[in-house]
Amino acid sequence: MIYHEDPQALHIGTLPKHCYFIPFAPGEDSFSARENSSRFELLNGEWDFRYYDSIVDMEDDFTVLPGREKMPVPSNWQLHGHDKPQYTNIAYPIPYDPPYVPDDIPVGVYSRNYSYNPDGMRRILTFEGADSCLYLYINGVFVGYSQVSH
C-alpha cells in the first residue's frame, strides 16, 4: 500500500470529521483537564523507535525493528539525533512532483505494547502530532492511514 503517493487517499480507516472532544463519565467534572477523565488515556512515554534515511530501506517486516532505540513520545526525531528539522520560509528543499514522493524521504517507525481492559467501551485512538503521514498497524494488521494529522 502506497497511500502517501495517492492524492485521493488522505485518510483511510479513520472516523468521519468531527469536533474534538474528550468523553467524561457521569459525575465527572467535564470542565477539568482531559487527563482527569476516567475515559481518557495518554500513550505518552518511551516508545520503541527505528529511523530510516529512506522508505526503501525499511524491512518488509517492520514489526521486528532491529536496531531500535527508545524515543520519547511526544517529541520529534529531529531533536533526538535523526535527520534535521525542515523549516523554511522559501522554496521547500524536497522535490515537488505530485503524486510521487522521493524515495529518500526519512521514515520513523514507532512501536509500543498496550494492554486494555475489554470493558465493552469503544476506544478511539487519536494522533495529535504525526507529521507528515502515518500508517497504523495493530498487532501487525493494517488499520489506517492519515496525512497531516496535527
Map each language-model feature to its residues.
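Accessory beta-strand-rich segments of carbohydrate-active enzymes
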Residues: 3-18, 29-34, 48-52, 82-84, ...
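Accessory carbohydrate-binding/adhesion or oligomerization-edge regions at the termini
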Residues: 1-90
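N-terminal [4Fe-4S]-dependent radical SAM core
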Residues: 97
